[in-house]
A protein has these predicted regions:
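Conserved acidic
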Residues: 1-212
Length: 212
């Protein structure tokens, strides 16, 4: 018998986001008769570095660089036999219509396995191409948390090379890196001048406020 599952969904609204302010999350942890999709699925191993080590490396060198893997989970296809487990109801916000049944073709935000699978693909490509992209391979292994990249290097020139390598290795893995932010010495000096006027960019790195 083929198992079928309909995943409930809910919106997560983040008004502070510069790109996608509303994200649809599929609740794979919702229980039916005491079980949920996530409780039965294999979540995979932890393959990314721990948060504390990443933050320490991020603060280590003079120039910091931040990037974001755009829609990381949606770059991975769900296998044909697993698609009935990724069903959901949708009526395009029209409450007069009966919901229709769809199947997700890509990995969903909310599945316990999504992070491991995405990180495995990302790290596998980095390892396969580490001879050609040594800087990027090191970043993917030690300075990547979920879909965020946050390395630091000694010089602006090294930052440019690292960004280029990460972009190229991302293309090989099917990932697009966006929202690049770099903290150069020039930016640091400008920040000190503008402290009183509050005219400096502010972002968050793993929940920690970072004044660029």
């Amino acid at each position: 018998m083929k198992i079928r599952e309909k995943l409930p969904d809910f919106p997560v609204v983040r008004a502070d986001r510069t790109t996608t302010k509303t994200r649809i999350v599929f609740d794979a942890s919702a229980k039916f008769r005491g079980k949920s999709f996530n409780s039965e699925a294999l979540s995979g191993l932890k393959v990314q570095a721990d948060m504390f080590s990443i933050l320490v490396r991020f603060r280590k060198e003079l120039v910091a660089l931040v990037g974001d893997l755009s829609q990381m989970y949606h770059q991975l296809f769900v296998t044909l036999e697993d698609r009935p487990l990724h069903r959901f109801l949708w009526r395009n916000l029209d409450q007069s219509k009966e919901p229709e049944v769809y199947e997700f073709l890509r990995y969903v935000f909310g599945g316990c396995y999504s992070l491991f699978c995405a990180q495995y693909v990302w790290q596998k490509h980095a390892d396969d191409h580490k001879a050609e992209y040594s800087l990027a391979a090191e970043v993917v292994k030690n300075s990547c948390y979920m879909d965020d990249l946050m390395p630091s290097v000694e010089t602006v020139e090294a930052t440019k090379e690292m960004r280029q390598q990460l972009t190229e290795i991302g293309h090989k893995a099917g990932f697009h890196i966006r929202k690049w932010i770099a903290q150069t010495p020039e930016a640091v000096r400008a920040t000190k001048v503008d402290l009183e006027r509050r005219e400096f960019p502010v972002t968050k790195i793993l929940g920690v406020v970072w004044i660029v």
